[in-house]
């Protein structure tokens, strides 16, 4: 029989988690270093790589982390409005989330002054998107960091606006993104194709949502070998993969299609009742379903190396109302049943943060809880075991209780298993939400 954590212990852990998040929320802005309202997150290299240096770790301010924590806390509050300590945290972080926006679009990073001169000759007085503290050396990598706005952060950022209006009222002048923003960048009738999608994903002209909001380079007649040649000479200006000064960069000069990004977009569209209006939603459902049937779990998400991030993202989109994911959800249930360890944990590939067991278990547990919310049959003993495992992983330092951050994002493609983003606050928020949902199924 699975060990069952008492409800009082679960409630205490939720309270401790919220206290930790309250105490760890940043109160002071140091421009270019840290920002009031955010939580600590880290951008780190696990091994040496060209242009990015050796093993290192730097604090990083980014939209994904801040909007992610905001949305978790907002969902928790709407599920239990007695949790009033959440409200000040939301009010403090929300302006910080908006700082990553340009109109209705969002970027992973803020616009900041360049770290160095980015081209020969006179420099324009212009800001660029870049990490806050990570040391980028040389013009090439600094120009490459100036990435375009993207569908992932735009979905998360607009979901934060949706939650803010839901909780605090609709008196603010902010307009939520409509489906056209996402439908303007679909994987159809293209004259280019990302090498990672070609090698590992297949499904050409899927019609699903592409990641980057920008004009990719085009070939008159695309061929993988042409694309590969350009990627091999990425450091030369003649390559489509070469980043140019002060121009928003799409990595490798080619847009990509990521299953987790698509699930995140579907969550926002479903929450805001825009899914039916979106041209890409049905194809996004099919794209995710095809990938899930294929079952290449370790290479599923371009930017998401954790094996169970897909399960979490899809289950959340289903719970948000996207019934087009029901077939995929059934496949995910089968995979979750097959891969849970005896102690209740789940694990990713060894190269991912030494199996990334805590983060994998948090994602898998939330996936099961979301799926159960959506009416799927999930044996409660499986959830009991996972909750018990998560409960035992909590840490206490300086009278604070938290869960150690695992991998929730990466640099993608060639640095997918090297350049990681982690945050104790993000993982602690995930576990707190899992505990809250668990109390409803006890």
PLM features: what roles do these ranges have?
Residues 3-442:
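Preference for long, amphipathic alpha-helical scaffolds in soluble/luminal domains
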């Amino acid at each position: 029989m699975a060990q069952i954590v008492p409800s009082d212990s679960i409630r205490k852990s939720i309270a401790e988690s919220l206290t930790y998040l309250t105490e760890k929320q940043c109160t002071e802005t140091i421009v270019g270093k840290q920002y009031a309202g955010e939580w600590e997150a880290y951008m780190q290299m696990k091994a040496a790589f060209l242009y990015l240096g050796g093993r290192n770790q730097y604090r990083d301010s980014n939209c994904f982390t801040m909007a992610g924590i905001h949305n978790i806390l907002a969902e928790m509050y709407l599920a239990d409005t007695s949790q009033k300590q959440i409200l000040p945290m939301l009010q403090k972080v929300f302006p910080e989330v908006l700082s990553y926006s340009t109109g209705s679009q969002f970027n992973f990073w803020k616009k900041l002054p360049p770290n160095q001169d980015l081209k020969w000759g006179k420099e324009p007085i212009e800001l660029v998107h870049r990490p806050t503290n990570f040391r980028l050396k040389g013009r090439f990598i600094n120009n490459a960091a100036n990435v375009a706005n993207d569908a992932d952060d735009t979905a998360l950022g607009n979901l934060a606006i949706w939650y803010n209006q839901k909780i605090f009222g609709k008196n603010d002048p902010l307009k939520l993104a409509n489906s056209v923003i996402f439908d303007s960048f679909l994987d159809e009738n293209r004259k280019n194709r990302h090498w990672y999608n070609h090698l590992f994903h297949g499904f050409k002209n899927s019609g699903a949502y592409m990641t980057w909001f920008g004009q990719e380079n085009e070939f008159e007649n695309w061929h993988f070998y042409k694309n590969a040649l350009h990627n091999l000479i990425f450091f030369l200006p003649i390559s489509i993969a070469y980043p140019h000064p002060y121009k928003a960069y799409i990595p490798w000069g080619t847009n990509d299609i990521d299953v987790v990004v698509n699930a995140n977009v579907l969550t926002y569209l479903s929450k805001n009742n825009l899914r039916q209006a979106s041209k890409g939603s049905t194809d996004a459902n099919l794209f995710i379903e095809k990938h899930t049937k294929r079952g290449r779990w370790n290479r599923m998400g371009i930017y998401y190396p954790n094996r169970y991030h897909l399960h979490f993202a899809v289950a959340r989109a289903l719970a948000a109302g996207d019934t087009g994911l029901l077939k995929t959800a059934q496949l995910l249930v089968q995979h979750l049943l097959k891969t849970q360890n005896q102690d209740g944990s789940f694990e990713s590939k060894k190269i991912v943060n030494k199996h990334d067991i805590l983060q994998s278990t948090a994602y898998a547990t939330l996936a099961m809880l979301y799926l159960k919310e959506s009416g799927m049959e999930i044996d409660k003993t499986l959830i009991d075991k996972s909750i018990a495992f998560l409960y035992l992983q909590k840490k206490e330092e300086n009278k604070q209780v938290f869960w150690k951050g695992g991998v929730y994002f990466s640099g993608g493609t060639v640095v997918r298993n090297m350049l990681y983003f982690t945050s104790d606050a993000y993982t602690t928020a995930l576990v707190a939400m899992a505990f809250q949902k668990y109390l409803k199924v006890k």
